[in-house]
Amino acid sequence: MLSLILFFPSFAFAATPVTPYYGPGHITFDWCGFGDSRSDCTNPQSPMSLDIPQQLCPKFSSKSSSSMFLSLHWNNHSSFVSYDYFNCGVEKVFYEGVNFSPRKQYSCWDEGVDGWIELKTRFYTKLYQMATTSRCIKLIQLQAPSSLPTLQAGVCRTNKQLPDNPRLALLSDTVPTSVQFVLPGSSGTTICTKHLVPFCYLNHGCFTTGGSCLPFGVSYVSDSFYYGYYDATPQIGSTESHDYVCDYLFMEPGTYNASTVGKFLVYPTKSYCMDTMNITVPVQAVQSIWSEQYASDDAIGQACKAPYCIFYNKTTPYTVTNGSDANHGDDEVRMMMQGLLRNSSCISPQGSTPLALYSTEMIYEPNYGSCPQFYKLFDTSGNENIDVISSSYFVATWVLLVVVVILIFVIISFFC
């Protein structure tokens, strides 16, 4: 009997390999997701169209045919489906982005399709960086500036739908002009301590009017903030070339001037409002691509980099054996998303570990984003790569187990 009792403590001290579950995970119940039709239970093809377990739909802010990038720049239009994304959670999983890709073949001026994929990468880079210190992310409509001058709607040279945000409008003259816009400190019950705001313009300056060359500049300005673009490079007539370019700005609540020198006025109509939490938690992003029949891009992978983001790349093409169509119901992603069904012990690029062997300290830096190769239940000395933070819960569990075995032995001895 003594050997049986000694078995349990010796087992506890044995180093056991940890095999991560590849895919996103969460350590606490305070998590949320952002998605598209592959996580949208309101889609008529659901649940066959889902890449996530159906019971997780309430955890995701999702809209079929939409994306967070697309929704920031456009309103609902025949070519675009906009959605007011809104979700809150200390830990965040992003699985969207494919609805704006080379398949859409979008270009506004001379930047081309590749130029817009670069803008998509810039947007998601800033979104993921800002989201690490925010619990809530909410796309909001901004109040239109008052006392707008006479404006004519801008157009794309390609006859595509010009982005609605920011608004790019043609002035009736070239007198330097400013209008005020406000980034609010709250939206409903959501506190906005920061905003993700697009700043877009046509580059290379010098827009021609009546054969004359006019410089061009735009800016967002307040007493404590300035961001602008100015270019007077002459490009006249048929040689004149312009790219639609966007930068994505971290801006605080307040009143700003949108100013212009030249032909166009640019001001924002939407922003992603975010609050601020007192810890930094890297976000997780899953590769969002089409099946091989359509062109995809790697913007999500390029945007999601350590230390602010953990990227989960597919290892096979988008492949469906039991979905609603060739682009909904990928076998590999469905398997990857199973890790979201339960709390995990640690999160890393290699996956999550659904073992209750780690303390809640794993959500804080520098623990979040790493998992040990082995665990030892009691021993916390030595190499940090093979030991994890033990907790009194597990110590108590093993002590109780030993006590129960001893008690059973005593009872058996008493009746014998």
Swiss-Prot record:
Protein source organism: Breda virus 1
Result, substituting F207A: Loss of lectin activity
Outcome following mutation: W109A: Reduced lectin activity
Glycosylation sites: N76, N257, N278, N313, N322, N343
Gene this chain is encoded by: HE
Ranges for region Esterase domain second part: 264-379
Transmembrane segments: 394-414
Name of the protein in its database record: Hemagglutinin-esterase
Region called Receptor binding, residue ranges: 122-263
Disulphide bridges: C41-C57, C88-C136, C200-C246, C206-C213, C304-C309, C346-C371
